[in-house]
Each structure stands twice: as C-alpha cells, then as structure tokens.
From Swiss-Prot:
Gene Ontology CC terms: nucleus
Induction: Down-regulated after exposure to far-red light. Subject to a negative feedback regulation by PHYA signaling.
UniProt organism field: Arabidopsis thaliana
Gene Ontology MF annotations: DNA-binding transcription factor activity; zinc ion binding
Protein name in the entry: Protein FAR-RED IMPAIRED RESPONSE 1
PROSITE patterns tied to this protein: ZF_SWIM (PS50966)
InterPro entries: FAR1_DNA_bnd_dom, FHY3/FAR1, MULE_transposase_dom, Znf_PMZ, Znf_SWIM
Disruption phenotype annotation: Elongated hypocotyls and reduced expansion of cotyledons under continuous far-red light. Reduced protochlorophyllide levels in darkness and less photobleaching in the light.
Positions annotated as zinc finger (SWIM-type): 555-591
Family that this chain belongs to: Belongs to the FHY3/FAR1 family.
Any one biological process term the GO annotation gives: positive regulation of circadian rhythm
Biased composition (Low complexity): 107-117
Pfam family name, one: FAR1
C-alpha cells in the first residue's frame, strides 16, 4: 500500500486530511531553463566570472566544483592543495584549491625516477581559492588569487584529463544550482558556456537533468518517517478536532509537501492576524528537516506559531500550495502584512495569492547578507558598513535616503552590483523611511536573534531528524503556552510599579499588558532626556526637532493641527505599536494629559484576545480550552449516532436545543449575581465611609458616644465580610435549582453549541452528519428561523463519503469559531 492509499484508508471516515495531487511535468526545470544551460544561445553582456570573496556554498565539495568550472572556462586544471579539520569536532573547516601547476616538481620526478610521474608540469603557480567554514555550516571564499605564471588554454580545456567525466560534471551542475546563491548560479552558468566542451555538456544536461532535479520533487524523509507523521497527526486530530493538516503528493504518489496547524494557532490568528512572518531559514540549512514556519506575536509580544510545513523545495509551485493551504487553515483571512526573505519565487507567490497584503522583507534577513556579499568591499574600505547603516537608519525622508544611497554606491564603486541595484528597486519592502504606513508589531528587527523568527533556534540544529523534532514539538508548544498563561495571569492580577508621576504612565498601566507597558514606560521616563525645538510651522502642520540626549541624536516629529496626528521619524509607533519619547515630548508641549485613542492599539491591551475574557486567570483559561476540546469530541460522537435514524436525530436535536437553553440561562444567572454582588459591595463601602466619617466627627464627644460609633463601624465591617462567600460562590457554575456547585459537577451537560458574536451554531466539523434542517419546526421561540440561520448550527449530511469523494476539510465557517464568551445572551 503506497502513501496515498494509506492516508485515504485512514482518513476516509472523518475527513480530517487534505490530499492534493498535482502533476508538474516540468517541476523545477525552470531553475535550469532560467539560465539556458545547453544549446547554442550566446551570452550577451559582460559578467565578471571571477570567484569573489564572500560567495558562499553549502559544502566544500560544492566550492571545489565551482572552482573546477571556473578553471575550465579559463583553461587550466585544478587540485586540492590542502584541507584542515577541527580538533574538537573533526569536521572540515578549511580547504585550499589551487592550479595544478601550484608548487614545484620534485627532483625525483623531474629526473624520471618516479614510477608515478605527474602529468602536469609544476611552475610554482600561485593561483588558488581558499575557502573556510562559517559557524552556520556555510563555506565562504576567504581568499582568491587570480594570476598564473603560465599560459592558459581555454579552447583546449575539454581535453584536460580532470574535465573528461562530463556526466559527473552534469550531476555537479545540478547540485551547484541548488547549493549556491543566485549570483553564484549565474556566474557558474556563464563559465559553463565559455568552456571548451560547452555543447556536449549542454546536451547531456538536457538529457539527464530531470533525474537530478527529481530530488526536489518529493520530501526526502528517512525510512519510516512518513508513517510516524501520519500516526502523530491522527492522534492529535483525535484529541482535538480543530487540529488541521494537509498533504501534497506528487504524480508518483510520493509525499512532496506537508502542512499542519494546531487548534491554538488557529484561534490565536483570529485575534492577531495583522502581521505574520514566513520563515524558510531551516529549509536552507537542514536537509533532514526542511521546516518552514508561519509566526506571529501575541499581546505580550511573545512569538506565536501559526503553522508549520515540511517542503521538498523552494519552487513557485511549493510556495503557492503552501500559502493556499495556510489560508484555508486560517479561515481564508489574509494578514495585513507578511514578512519574508527575498526569494523571487516566494515574492511571486505572495503577489498572486495575497494581493491586498503588504509584503515586506525582514530587515535582519537583508542586513545579514551585507557582510557576505560585500566582504571584498569591507576589506578595502573599513567604513563601508558605517556608511551603509547610516543610509538605512539615519535617513528621515525618501529623498535623503536616495541621495545617501547613490553617494555610497558611487563612493565604493558598486554601480554595477546587481544585488545592490535589486535591493534599491525593492526599497519600499525593507527600508524604514519607506514603511511609515506599515505596522510591524516589533517583528522586523536588525538581528535574527532579536526577532520572533528565532522561535525554534535553540531546539533545531543541522543534524536533527524528524523523529527527534516530533518528540520535542509538543514540549516546545507547551512551554510557549505556559509562558503566555503566566503573562496573562500577571497582567490580570498584578499591578505594575509606576516610576513617575506622568499621567500617561498611570493611564497605560491599566490598559497595556505588562510586557508592553514596561516597554512604553521606558519611553515615558526617557522624555526628560529630550529637548524639542520648533523647526517650522504653518496653519496646518508644525515640525519639531527633538534632541535625544540619551541616544545622542536628533529626531524630527511632525504634528498635524487639523487631524491631531503625530509622526516621529524614528518610526517606533510603526515598528512597535506604541509612542516613542520624542512623540510624547510633543504631546506634552501640546497639553495632552492622556494618550489619544488612535495611538493605543487593541492588540497590545489586556482585552486583545477576542475569545477570552480579560479577567480570567491562567488556570481558568487552560481549563476552559480543555472543556471546549472535550465537548467538541463528544459532539462528534453524538453526530455519528444521531444521524443513523430519524428517531435518533430528533432525540439528539431536542437534547441540543434544551442543553443550549440551560447553559445560556446558567450563564445569564451567573452574570446577574456577579453584578448584584458588585452593587452590594459598593453600597457596603459607601456606608462604611459614612460611618467612619461620623466617628471622626464625634472625637470631642463623650467616651460612650465614641464606643457607639466604633460598634457601628464594626457591625458594618462584619456585614461586608458576610458578603464575601457569595462573591466567591458566584464564580462557580450554577445548576437549574439555584444550587451553586463546582464546574466539575455540571460538566456532563452537553453544551454542544458554539456561540459566535451573533446567534448560535454548532461547530461544522463536529455536527457534519445532522443534515439540513429547513423542514424542522421552531423548537424554542423561533430559535430556527430559516435555512440561513441554521447553516452555522449544523452541517450537511455527508458523514459517509459518496463515490469520487475528494478528501478536503470543510472550513468555510471556521473563521467565526472561538471559545464562548460569558456575556449575557438571550434566545
């Protein structure tokens, strides 16, 4: 039984897996076609074919193949001069490749006494390429010596002995295309075109290329990994019906791509779908675990995992399938902003599938490439990075950035650098001054270690296997959820310490979550280090230059008088979502005693999560999620039994309607008692205050009067204490006879209905078998009014799949699924 048959046989009864088979006969061939390897197409343009310092490779073998192809294009042969291993790990860390004429011929060989004479005469040529291994595992060109002391013969390169194994060269061509950067690929292809055996290599490439590219057409898992994945997903799906996963098979029924998202990820996305980061870092450096992640941040600025994928490659087809699948899992709701790397296929997929989403590059991803791409410039000019950073971070306007950029390009002779030109062309996606209208929730940082993309960094290493990852996956998520629960509890039950008399600090201490408040508090305290100076002013706008003594820099702040809007050129509000000290300084000058509401983002507040009440503690939240999952599972069982016959169906339906009414009445009674307790407590405090005031007024009267006043105060305090048990009891569940008991006593009630913001419905996945109810008469005060009203409560009869059934998840109504609120509701 192949993988698809296995999946279908296991998934056919509960519709829990999405299997997609899409034949792509030319899959990945585009990588080869892009550079026109083979054929008689000539090359136009002057591309520098020399190896450059800073070019990186996945392995030292790939670096040597690259140098071999360069040698072939120039007309010399190569050899491995030396290599070095680490004393600790025993891994290769250093290698030197040289011209075959490097060094001198030993006297024994020159005299003819050696039985193994060298076929290449040594001339003490110094031409070589020195590569070193970086800590991340990549190999980088450390030093390149170009000049030879002998004649080069490019026209006869094909006759060199080391170049005759064309099939090996062809195989290496494909490996190189996957192993090196885009710029390196183009250089390599040009070398092949100019080599002596160009036409032969091209024809063989077109003949055998499909077998090599085939590596990217399926997920390279170890033996047994597919079954482990399937069993793992089946178990999680059984425990929680809201768990989502989808599988992409190629035309040979082999696993190509895989995506999954847990229930909490899908619920969290309902509240925090403004900014999402899509990270493929692990795909690039880990062949055993090519993991792609969708990541967001919650209201505590903690990373949230919004979906995981294992992918066979980074092709256009893969990215299209993955983004489509992720959108389905998230209810079809696209994010406002998505952060990615600069992959061109990924850019095309985002543009096609997320047309209304702002696509940005992660700033750290751009900046980390600068030392690699421009190491040769940095060796000659020590101030290159300083100039580059000044251009990026100290340009306050678009014109100022362009002026500094082209000045830098001219100063360091980079006018023809393709990657730098490409970066400037897409500057709206990553340069801060061009992103003043984009909120990034603090997710775009200058270093990866500071970003939420480091979600799994401490758990994933280059040699980790899938089985090892799955063993850690649950622990990782549990740790994250516990961190969020602790932060929720602290925010709800602890008061942050105030460090100044600022009214802004007092205002936001009761509004922001603790984490965000502490960050905002730093800005409030920093106001004293700011000195504003008005630059210019007209009837609509005023511009201030704020000197920040702590940061030793000046920042421009604009104030719109007509719109009451602030804009600081440090972009803190746009990047992090709260006002900076420079903007607060101007608010203070304008007489604002509170933060304007447009600068208080709900996503950073205590009540940011739409499905969870702000006053609930961490333990209550965890218990509530468990109850919800348990009810979903039981609802599925009820649906299976209730759809067998009309009689069973009517029994199940009456039970659902009656149970829903009981739960709604119980929640309403609970809320009414809570409000009553609140009013009683308020009245008690008022009477107590009046009594204490009377005690103070009678200080000069007789001792008898003093004692009487004290007795009255004591009686009122006892009255207040007698009300405390009622307040405590009101937090427990209540049965229909008015008895207040713990939640566990009433968990058996089948609260199978899931309340949205308006109306009531049953989770589509749990009640799929109940069928259409347009023929059912109203049961409770027009509870069922029409077919549309019923669509959210029950699904269509489709429990046993008909012939030719396509295995897909019914997700049309998932976007409204969330935990019930506890506000009063009326049927």
């Amino acid at each position: 039984m192949d993988l698809q048959e296995n999946l279908v046989s296991d998934a056919g009864d509960d519709h829990m897996v999405d299997i997609v088979v899409e034949p792509h006969s030319n899959r990945d061939i585009g990588i080869v076609d892009e550079f026109n390897i083979g054929g008689d197409v000539g090359f136009s343009g002057d591309l520098d074919l020399e190896p450059r310092n800073g070019i990186d490779f996945d392995t030292h073998e790939a670096a040597y193949i690259f140098y071999q192809e360069y040698a072939k294009s120039m007309g010399f042969t190569t050899s491995i001069k030396n290599s070095r291993r680490s004393k600790k790990t025993k891994d290769f860390i250093d290698a030197k490749f040289a011209c075959s004429r490097y060094g001198v011929t030993p006297e024994s060989e020159s005299s003819g006494s050696s039985s193994r004479r060298s076929t290449v005469k040594k001339t003490d040529c110094k031409a070589s390429m020195h590569v070193k291994r970086r800590p991340d595992g990549k190999w980088i060109i450390h030093e390149f010596v170009k000049d030879h002391n002998h004649e080069l013969l490019p026209a006869l390169a094909y006759h060199f002995r080391i170049q005759r194994n064309v099939k090996l060269a062809e195989k290496n061509n494909i490996d190189i295309l996957h192993a090196v950067s885009e710029r390196t690929k183009k250089m390599y292809v040009e070398m092949s075109r100019q080599s002596g055996g160009y036409k032969n290599i091209g024809s063989l490439l077109q003949t055998d290329v499909s077998s090599q590219v085939d590596k990217g057409r399926y997920l390279a898992l170890e033996e047994g990994d597919s079954q482990v994945l399937l069993e793992y997903f089946k178990r999680i799906k059984k425990e929680n019906p809201k768990f989502f996963y989808a599988i992409d098979l190629n035309e040979d029924q082999r696993l190509r791509n895989l995506f999954w998202a847990d229930a909490k990820s899908r619920d969290d996305y309902l509240s925090f779908n403004d900014v999402v980061s899509f990270d493929t870092t692990y795909v690039k450096f880990n062949d055993k675990l090519p993991l792609a992640l969708f990541i967001g941040v919650n209201h505590h600025s903690q990373p949230m995992l919004l979906g995981c994928a294992l992918v066979a490659d980074e092709s256009m087809e893969t990215f299209v399938w993955l983004i489509k699948t992720w959108l389905r899992a998230m209810g079809g709701r696209a994010p406002k902003v998505i952060l990615t790397d600069q992959d061109k296929f990924l850019m095309s997929a985002v543009s096609e599938l997320l047309p209304n989403t702002r696509h940005c590059f992660a700033l750290w991803h751009v900046l980390e490439k600068i030392p690699e791409y421009f190491s040769h410039v940095m060796k000659r000019h020590e101030n290159f990075l300083l100039k580059f950073n000044k251009c990026i971070f100290r340009s306050w306007t678009d014109d100022e950035f362009d002026m500094r950029w082209w000045k830098m390009v001219s100063q360091f002779g980079l006018e023809n650098d393709e990657w730098l030109l490409w970066l400037h062309e897409h500057r709206q996606k990553w340069v801060p001054t061009f992103m003043s209208d984009v909120f990034l929730a603090g997710m775009s940082t200058s270093q990866r270690s500071e970003s939420v993309n480091s979600f799994f960094d401490k758990y994933i290493h280059k040699k980790i296997t899938l089985k090892e990852f799955l063993r850690q996956y649950g622990v990782i998520l549990q740790n994250r959820y516990e961190e969020e629960s602790v932060a929720d509890f602290d925010t709800c039950h602890k008061q942050p310490a105030l460090k100044s008399p600022s009214p802004w600090e007092k205002q936001m201490a009761t509004t922001y979550t603790h984490t965000i408040f502490k960050k905002f508090q730093v800005e409030v305290l920093g106001v004293v280090a700011c000195h504003p100076r008005k630059e210019k002013e007209d009837e609509n706008m005023a511009t201030f230059r704020v000197q920040d003594c702590e940061k030793d820099d000046d920042f421009l702040v604009t104030w719109s008088k007509t719109k009451s809007e602030l804009c600081c050129f440090c972009r803190m509000f746009e990047y992090k979502g709260f006002l900076c000290r420079h903007a607060l300084m101007i608010l203070q000058m304008c007489g604002f005693a509170s933060i304007p509401p447009q600068y208080i983002l709900k996503r950073w507040t205590k009540d940011a999560k739409s499905g969870v009440l702000a006053g609930e503690g961490a333990d209550q939240i965890q218990t509530r999620v468990q109850r919800y999952n348990d009810l979903c599972s039981r609802a599925t069982e009820l649906s299976e039994e209730g759809c067998v016959s009309e009689e069973n169906y009517n029994i199940a339906l009456r039970t659902l309607v009656e149970t829903l009414k009981n739960c709604v009445d119980m929640n309403n009674a609970r809320n009414n008692i809570t409000e009553s307790n609140s009013q009683l407590n308020n009245g008690t405090h008022e009477e107590e205050n009046q009594v204490m005031a009377g005690v103070k007024a009678t200080k000069k009267k007789t001792v008898y009067r003093k004692r009487k006043g004290q007795q009255e105060a004591s009686q009122m305090l006892e009255s207040q204490q007698s009300l405390q048990p009622m307040e405590t009891i009101s937090s427990e569940a209540m049965d229909m006879n008015g008895y207040y008991g713990p939640q566990q006593n009433v968990q058996g009630l089948l609260n199978l209905m899931e309340p949205p913001h308006e109306g009531y419905y049953v989770d589509q996945r749990t009640i799929q078998g109940l069928g259409q109810l347009n023929s059912i008469a109203p049961a409770q005060d027009s509870f069922f009014t029409n077919q549309q009203a019923m669509s959210g409560m029950v699904g269509q009869i489709d429990f046993r799949p008909p012939p030719n059934f396509t295995y897909t998840l019914q997700e049309e109504h998932l976007s409204s699924a969330q935990l019930p609120g506890s506000s009063s509701r009326q049927l």
